[in-house]
């Protein structure tokens, strides 16, 4: 067993860049351990991930704000505080804040993350209309 004591582990909040659009900050809760990584992620309005998938899936727990999650080939689904999302292994998706709200979620990522192309402004607008 390991216990990770929040900010005591010395991890700093990180500005996320090349695999995100807009301003996104991640606060590492648990470093990659046994193929599991946990981050609290803050998205400014309209900010979002690129398309990606996870080798063993991902769990999102929305803690504040409003946002969207979109699976390839489908319309985006709204996210609100209190929502929990299970994304199966290798399912291509993106998630991020609504255009008029920030979004804060805890991301529990299982296995390797396969980062892909950016979600364009037109794709974001079309999926969330």
Where are the predicted features?
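A short, N-terminal "cap"/entry segment at the start of jelly-roll beta-barrel domains
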Residues: 1-36, 115-129
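Conserved strand-loop elements at the edges of beta-sheets that form or border functional pockets
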Residues: 31, 53, 61, 79-81, ...
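Conserved short histidine dyad/triad with adjacent acidic residue
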Residues: 39-54, 89
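Short beta-strand His + acidic residue motifs that chelate non-heme Fe in jelly-roll/DSBH
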Residues: 49-51, 69-70, 92-99
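Glycine- and acidic-residue-biased ligand/ion/polar-headgroup-sensing regions
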Residues: 55-67, 72-73
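A short hydrophobic beta-strand segment most commonly corresponding to one strand
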Residues: 59, 86, 100-118
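Short acidic-glycine-tyrosine-enriched beta hairpin
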Residues: 73-89
